[in-house]
Amino acid sequence: MTNLEKMREKLQDQINYHNVLYHQKNKPEISDAEYDELKKKLAEIEPEIYATQDSVGAPPDERFSKVEHQEPMLSLENAYDEQGVEKFLSKIKRFLIEDKIEILCEPKIDGLSFSAIYEDGRFVKAATRGDGFVGEDVTHNVATIKGFPKFLQGVQGRLEVRGEIYISNSDFLKLNENDEFANPRNAAAGSLKQLDANITASRPLRYFAYSLIGGAEKSQSEVLNKLEALGFCVNEHQSLTSSLDGMLKFYNEVYNCRYNLDYDIDGIVYKVNDLVLQNRLGNTHKAPRSALAYKFSAVYAKTKLNKIFIQVGRTGVLTPVADLVPVNVGGVLVSRASLHNQDEIKRKDIREGDIVTIKRAGDVIPQIVEVSRDSRLPNTPEFVFPEVCPECGSKVRQVEGEAAVRCPEEFACKAQMIEKLKHFVSKDAFDIVGLGDKQIEFFYDLGLIKQIHDIFTLEERLDEFNLEEQSGWGEKSIANLLNSIQSRRVITLDRFIFSLGIRFIGQVAAELLADYYVSYNNWYNSMIELSLDNTELVGIDGIGKKGAESLESFFSKEHNIKMLNDLTACLQILPVSSNSSNSVLNNKIIVFTGKLLAMSRGEAKVRAKTLGAKVSSHLSAKTDYLIAGEKPGSKYKKAVELGVEILDEDQWHKVISLGVFK
């Protein structure tokens, strides 16, 4: 087994182990940050899909009933320095075309997120975040929390309260006399997720409420006041400000007094105070645009770099990774650090055997920030980046202008093929239960799954292969795997596109492509024609030149075309069904030009997409409407020549507010 495979397997085993402890045995051994650290180390193997690998939460625990959130419980975007906060403030000002925006600042409680539902004032249900869309039903457990309101006086209809459950530091010391828990966060998680509510009742759980859905409040500060009036616990540390200086001042004040608090916090949360503006800002794929978590400063530690080894990812990138003498950095035991690429190694002059300084900020993958050259032994050789792939022996290549070095043998390199297969069956792609990393490697080595479509013809080949003779396989486990594969023969278009593992086409880009082309045949036929003209694809808002070039490269290879034909013969790929079928903009291709006065270009695009439109930057005969603001460019003249209907800003506002064109 190669170094890459060993590390990949080790990380996956660790994640699976902690999943069982956290979700099934209620005995978590590591914090959320440490768990995220493992996942992001795993994602480091394939750095180009790092953003698409990140998830909002964890899958719902099968031991509990599932609760679907009416509004997703999204995570927050993170910042780790003042520049990140400044960027957040500037971005929302540009989006809303506002010079002054009121921001509410609150501490970020290091606890467990919850949602509580009230019907006509009566507490009826509570759920965890889960994966952000579906959580676990913990109604009976939340009901045992001392002081948690069971009835809200004068409340009619449905009301949802969200917040954070925690255990205070003083209570944790009493609870943890036998060192059963690693920290207060894990103790709270383990206590809340008990099948026996009596155990939960015996634990000193507390909470802070911070969100109210279904009320009439107009601002976040009003929400907090209302929650307090209804009898909920609300954190006393909060501040309203309209300036960057005010935001940073609150951060510094709380940072300096954090050890005087009787509960753990790991940063500050900034929220746009006006709820109407929050609604206008909307959400990205993973987080609300109206909020930011400014995590506390990075933690540093020194250790020895034992060895630099190379990982080969799904797209062929050779990524150097530092193997370290394990060191505790901010409560997390770090034994690996990212070295990014050969340019980074040369720039910092990193060598095996060096004493290095490790930086860890929040849940970001640890980085080497400094090398102690005074401690370096004489004649320590420079690290030489391999000229051949460590997995298949092929001569590596580096594209001009890129730092990444790649193995070109996309289909002959075992490491790449195994990683492609793992990606294909992963949770966000085909999600084939029972076909995990170890099983993929097992079937690949046996020659039973060499190509992606082999997965769906596995049953036929097993007729000639006695799998029951292999360790760990029996009649039941084989039947379960084949049933799992069979159940995944129907898939949505966006998940199918994502499953192919095309460079620069992550979950968000796959959704954009699916929404734009609607059906697999439309998408496939358009991609086949890319060699003739890719301007339409480049114009799709959010795809860009790199994504278009990557798709063009993918579809130029006969191997990929054959793979798609073989694969689609086994599948049913569902077309996109629009949730905006009654909108006059549904499935219309829209292009913007000129300056809009009432809203930013960014907000206009979001509004258009919400109504089912396809936003493009490329004007063609296929364009349905050109939205023209002040001082329109050459697109206006071209639209006239092509006969594309042109809407001015007043007409545009009628469309998005009234649903009419004139």
Curated annotation (Swiss-Prot):
This is DNA ligase. It holds the Pfam family DNA_ligase_aden. GO terms for biological process: DNA repair; DNA replication. DNA ligase that catalyzes the formation of phosphodiester linkages between 5'-phosphoryl and 3'-hydroxyl groups in double-stranded DNA using NAD as a coenzyme and as the energy source for the reaction. It is essential for DNA replication and repair of damaged DNA. Its EC number is 6.5.1.2. Disulfide bonds: none annotated. PANTHER family: CHROMOSOME TRANSMISSION FIDELITY FACTOR 18, DNA LIGASE. Residues 580-662 form the BRCT domain. The active site is at K108 (n6-amp-lysine intermediate). One of its GO terms (cellular component) is cytosol. Zn(2+) binds at C389, C392, C407, C413. InterPro entries: BRCT_dom (IPR001357), BRCT_dom_sf (IPR036420), DisA/LigA_HHH (IPR041663), DNA_ligase (IPR001679), DNA_ligase_AS (IPR018239), DNA_ligase_CS (IPR033136), DNAligase_adenylation (IPR013839), DNAligase_N (IPR013840). The keyword Manganese applies.
